[in-house]
Every structure is written in C-alpha cells, then in structure tokens.
C-alpha cells in the first residue's frame, strides 16, 4: 500500500488500512485539548474513506519523519540576478526533498538577449534556467516513492512567452514541468478586439504582435501537445479573499491552488460516492446533515494539520500560519452522479452540483467561523477588508454576519484537487470533479523494486452497480465516461462548481481527436466567459 508507514528497513509498521487511518487521526488530534475525543471523531471521518486527506497527510502524519504534510507550494519570486536565481533553486530542492511539489513564476527573469550589466554578456533567459530546475527535479525523489512535480508559469506579456509556449515541443525538454500561461483580462480583450499586444519587461517593449497571433500560438500548442494550460490570473486575483494583503503570481503543479510567494497547498476531499443513500434508485440522495457534519470535522482536521506539519522553509511556515489557508474539495463526484441516476454535464447534474457544493461551502465556512470563536481568527484577518474582498461578498448573508461578529479561522477553505492516487486508494472512486475516465481498465503499477505490474481495475460505481443489480443488467444512461462527453459537458460542470470554490479547480477537458481547431479555441473562450479560473484540455493525437 502506497501510504503504509514502514520502518527504514522496509518492514510495515501499519499492518492494516485501519492502522494507517488511526495513525493519521492520532497525529491530527494532537493540537486539541481533548485529543482522545477528537481522535475518535477524526477516525470516524476517515473510515469507509468518507474523508480523504491528501496523500502527504496520509503518508506522513504521525511518522515523525522529516517530511511536510503539505502537498505543494508556490515558491518565492525569483530575483533577476545569478545569486538570487540559485538561492531560489536551493529552496526548490529543499522543498522537493521533503515531499512538496512546487510552482514557480519565471516572468521575473529578464528575456533572452538582454544585457547583463557589469559582465559584458547577454542574459540566457528564463527558459535556460527552467532547464536547470528540470535537471534538479530529475535527481530528487520526494519523500517515500513520490516523484517531485513542478509547475512553471509565465505572463502573456513576457518577451520570451513564444519560446515558453513551444518549449516542451522539443523532445525530452522540461519533462518534469507542467506549463501554464498567465493570461490577463487585457489580453483577452485584445484578442476579442483584434488589437496589437506588447511583449515587455521592466517597462521596455521588446516586440509587438497581433494579440490573436499569440493566442493562436497558445491554442495550437494545446491542440497538438496539450500544453501550456491557460490561467486567468486577473480573475484569480480579483476573486481572492486575501487580495487586500497578497498578490498571486502562480499555482501549485496541478493548478487547483493559486498561491502567493511561499504559499502552501493543504488538501483534503469529501468522498461524495460514500454518502449516496439508496444508490441506483429513485430515492438516491445525499444526506445533507451527514455531509455537513463530515465537512465540519474535515475543516478541523485540515486546520490542525497546519500546526502539526513540518515545513521545508521558515518562509513557508510563516505564510501558512499567518493565513491558515486550506483546500477542502470533493472526490467520487462523477460516481455520486451515476449512483443518483444523473448524467454528467446535464442540466440536472449542474443543479445537483450547485446544491451539493452550496451545502459544502456553507458547512466549511460555518466550521471555520466556529473554530475562530474557539481558537482565534487567522493572524492576517482584517474584518472590514476581508468582508469586502474577492468572492467573500457573494457568501450567504448569515455567514457574512457571523464572520463580522466572530471572525474566521481560515482565509480560504475550498479547492478541487485531481485526487488521482487517493481516489484509487478509496476503492477507485472517480477523481475530483472529473468524469469516470473508463469503467474498467488496466493500470500499470511501479513496484518498490522498480518492476512494473499490470492490474485490472474497475470504477467504484460500476462495481457497486454490478453487485447490486447483477452482471447482466444493462447500465443506466448515467454511466458515461470521459470519452463520450462533449467539451461543453465538462465546461458547464467546472463553471457550476467554481461558483462555490474560493480557490480553484484542477480539471482536464477531454476533446475528441477529430475536433476542429476553431471549435477547440472556442473551449477556452467559453471557459473565460463562464467564469472559470483556468482551462486545461487534452486532445489525443499521435504526438
């Protein structure tokens, strides 16, 4: 088992999954005055995989090893000088050594060919330093058996953006990175109005080109190579509840957590598939009282994780404890829809998404308000500024009134992670917001000795349906997989969920290979119009 605690010699200390869950519950209850009471509450939330903390928490909590319980970090801004660049590289290496993935914004580095004062040379540009980061990542294994992940972003107005867009088209280059372009509102307006776009650095314009030409380069790279992703950075900052005290320039490797410099990504997911009562019947539903209680416990567990976790860097600890940001999300979402008899992407699915996520949003914010009353608000809480910032004014009136009177423990509370590995751990429920990729498939598993083994796996809802209805009963119309859905089906679900998520969503929009380029470009424009914070697509091709 991936998350089993083992001795240095490889002998299992966790003998069973309940042992692992008990270890995690015990560790996360340590900050409580009545730790035994909360240990039992936390363990109950973890049983049957109802609440799934992120992998770093499951594997590291209670082991006393020098690892972080935060999955990912956005690192500090890279100074535009050699000593600062390699200090940033050192910080990245130390973070990855403890098991954290990292995000970096390379827009702060001067473009290739710019003069370097005092040395009589020209700058090699940000892409050359990304190669150095890539080499570093190749040599560092994260804690346990988890390889490091990295996200590199660059602003759409950086002079080297065209090279950035095409960087991974070179065989073998930057394979340890995910790449995304930070797209501004001004750029989207320039694309719409077909005006010129300046590429500049430090107030110097290096090139001007039609905005649509640059947009087409981004789109064609995605059409053929599935990268770079698009992040609507102005929308992210505009809707950030902390925009009164921070500016976001990057995201964690999967994109669900836009973060400020040294920001940390603490994740956990409610497994909706485990909460459906009377599955595959007309009475199928989620018990909203049970969901609310589970969310309340999960928020407390994640908040405690901030206090028990180690941090690779002091700056990361300071940032996390000053803002107490958490990212509570969902997994098993598509399975829950199937069990409720609802087709992913349908209007009924959109309505159910909003109903479930509104319940989760309310429960999470109320839990954090109650924690603030008990333990205090996050240190950088400014009542007037917080209540008027970002997405906070859109919350229900009773929540706003409660925050005004009692404060709030956590600055941000919700995020939708991809949850690939923990979903497999939880009996192969569907991942995050994603539709079921395939109801039965072969998974290639790398073993501890480096060998690979093929395993036949089936989706959770599919196996449950077969157990309840029999092997020969036809599947219902709700059994749709990613390949049978249109891009619009994906988009409406992402947009519906984003309304109730204060951070962001990791989501891939699967496209048919036959999709026309014009229709492909429309996906991104539609995502922007629907209020999404980012857009990532995958179109299968021979590359």
Name each model feature, range by range.
Residues 1-2, 44-62, 156, 297-308, ...:
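Core structural elements
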Residues 1-69, 215-219, 525, 529, ...:
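Acidic/polar, glycine-rich intrinsically disordered N-terminal extensions of enzymes
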Residues 33-42, 101-104, 144-151, 229-232, ...:
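Flexible, glycine/charged-enriched surface loops at secondary-structure junctions
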Residues 70-287, 311-315, 364, 368-371:
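Active-site cavity-forming subdomains of large catalytic enzyme subunits
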Residues 111-150, 277-310, 366, 374, ...:
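A structural-propensity feature for long, helix-poor, extended segments
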Residues 166, 181-183, 187, 192, ...:
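Terminal amphipathic helices with adjacent charged low-complexity linkers/tails
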Residues 201-204, 294-317, 321, 342-419, ...:
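Internal maturation/activation junctions in enzymes
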Residues 249, 255-258, 302-307, 389-393, ...:
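Catalytic alpha/beta core of large soluble enzyme barrels
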